[in-house]
């Protein structure tokens, strides 16, 4: 059975795809279909994101265990480690050189990508963490997972939910912090946990990045037995003086900043289990999403036959 063993886990990304559109989940995750257009159009964004994540991992591994790491981050930047890590990331993720050594001069779009990654990492991200340095970095790119037991009718399933967290910190107040790096436009607001799973229009309510980060928080909270603070680092926007990486929940015009996963854990985990029960219910087909707001840029329109 898929997603019930160590070799084939259900990732947070796959889970949030199902929340938005079960049929897209079927095409994308179960059948593993990929259109040529999807691959062509996404290569630049994927390349940029992969290079940034690899460079951040290489750089922040050098801060592991440093409390209040502003001095360490400043030292690394002054020693040129940002540039070195970006070049190593390009060598590893783009050219496939496992030793991280560039063997040729860069040209065209790769030069542009390198310059932007250097700016996002060496200025936006480092400046933010230097200013807000009340943390100790625990791990980068850590594989995490947990078993979620569910029952569907007479059948029982142990769902293996697993992924790779970009960064885990310990905060001075004793919390763990899970950070997900993003290179797109900030989307940190949501209208309550229920809206993340059932809200419409789908494209603007079922925020995949928030769902994914809450799933990482759920896994870490269960595994470590500690409270977790979920945060999204939209690195392109961290240069703003008023930038905050924390989620803002707004219900009935009342807003609150989500400082603790525990504040939403019961409701969120109920929704996760209910979604998994639906996913594994043999009598429920992989259907099209309820409205077409999420269909505009979907690469499966030609085979979906939505009317």
Label the predicted regions:
Residues 21-34, 90, 94, 175-194, ...:
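Active-site-adjacent bridging/hinge elements
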Residues 22, 30, 34, 55-67, ...:
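A generic secondary-structure signal for well-formed alpha-helical elements
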């Amino acid at each position: 059975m898929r997603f019930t063993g160590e070799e084939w886990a259900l990732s947070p990304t796959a889970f949030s795809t199902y929340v938005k559109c079960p049929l897209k989940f079927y095409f994308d995750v179960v059948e593993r279909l990929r259109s040529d257009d999807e691959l062509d159009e996404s290569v630049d964004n994927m390349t940029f994101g992969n290079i940034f994540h690899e460079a951040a991992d290489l750089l922040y591994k050098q801060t592991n265990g440093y409390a209040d790491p502003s001095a360490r981050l400043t030292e690394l930047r002054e020693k040129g480690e940002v540039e070195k890590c970006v070049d190593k990331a390009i060598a590893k993720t783009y050219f496939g050189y496992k030793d991280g050594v560039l063997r040729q001069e860069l040209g065209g779009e790769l030069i542009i990508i390198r310059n932007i990654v250097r700016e996002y990492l060496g200025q936006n991200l480092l400046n933010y963490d230097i200013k807000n340095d009340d943390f100790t970095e625990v791990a980068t790119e850590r594989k995490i997972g947990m078993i979620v037991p569910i029952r569907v009718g007479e059948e029982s399933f142990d769902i293996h939910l697993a992924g790779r967290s970009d960064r885990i910190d310990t905060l001075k107040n004793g919390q763990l912090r899970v950070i997900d790096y993003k290179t797109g436009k900030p989307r940190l607001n949501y209208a309550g946990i229920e809206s993340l799973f059932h809200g419409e229009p789908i494209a603007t309510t079922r925020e995949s990045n928030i769902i994914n980060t809450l799933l990482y928080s759920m896994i870490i909270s269960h595994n470590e037995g500690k409270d977790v603070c979920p945060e999204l680092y939209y690195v392109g926007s961290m240069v703003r003086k008023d930038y905050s990486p924390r989620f803002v929940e707004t219900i009935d015009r009342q807003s609150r900043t989500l400082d603790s996963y525990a504040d939403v854990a019961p409701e969120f985990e109920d929704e996760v289990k209910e979604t998994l029960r639906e996913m594994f219910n043999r009598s429920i087909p992989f259907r099209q999403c309820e409205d077409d707001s999420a269909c505009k840029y979907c690469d499966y329109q030609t085979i979906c036959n939505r009317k």
